[in-house]
Swiss-Prot record:
It comes from Acropora millepora (Staghorn coral). It is found in: Secreted. Residues 1-58, 80-102 have a biased composition (Acidic residues). Its main location: secreted. Residues 103-112 have a biased composition (Polar residues). Keywords: Secreted. Disulfide bonds: none annotated. The keyword Secreted applies. It comes from the Eukaryota. Component of the acid-insoluble and acid-soluble organic matrix of the aragonitic skeleton (at protein level). This is Secreted acidic protein 2.
Length: 165
């Protein structure tokens, strides 16, 4: 085989053709490769989409952490308030305490129930106080009206007696 020039594709033609198809379009092929490079840039865009997905999953993990902290904080509040309820109630048995409530959900339910009954008790206190005030006003009104009736009756009796004479 003898080749003339710097032809490396062994097809017998001369020139700087390297793509084995006989024509001299290596510049165009390089442009096509550049286009595929642009497609590689599109692949980089898909890589950016993957990065966005990983960022979102990172945000999801961050969203879970405060919820866990908040749950622990709320359990602590429920435990402390159940201690207060047991100390405040003088009639409760000493054996009933935090040891009796192994499950935090039971302590939370009991705490919410005691809060509900505390609200009912305070409403009942307000209503009974209002009822007592109403009873006082009725009794005061009865005293005034009975006094007024007695005054009118005695005045009429005096007038009647004076007219007889």
């Amino acid at each position: 085989w003898s080749x003339s020039g710097d032809d490396d594709d062994d097809d017998g033609d001369s020139g700087d053709d390297d793509d084995d198809d006989g024509d001299d379009d290596s510049d165009d092929d390089n442009d096509a490769d550049d286009d595929s490079g642009a497609e590689d840039d599109n692949d980089d865009d898909s890589g950016d989409e993957n990065e966005d997905d990983t960022d979102d999953s990172g945000d999801d993990v961050k969203m879970i952490k405060p919820t866990t902290v908040m749950t622990g904080w709320m359990m602590t509040i429920a435990d402390e308030s159940s201690d207060d309820d047991n100390e405040r109630d003088d009639t409760s048995d000493d054996s009933v305490g935090d040891d009796a409530y192994n499950d935090d959900s039971q302590a939370g339910e009991l705490n919410s129930d005691s809060t509900y009954y505390d609200q009912l008790r305070s409403q009942g206190d307000v209503q009974s106080q209002q009822g007592f005030k109403n009873l006082q006003s009725y009794s005061n009104g009865f005293k005034v009206s009975s006094g007024l009736v007695a005054t009118v009756v005695s005045t009429l009796a005096c007038l009647f007696l004076t007219n007889l004479h």
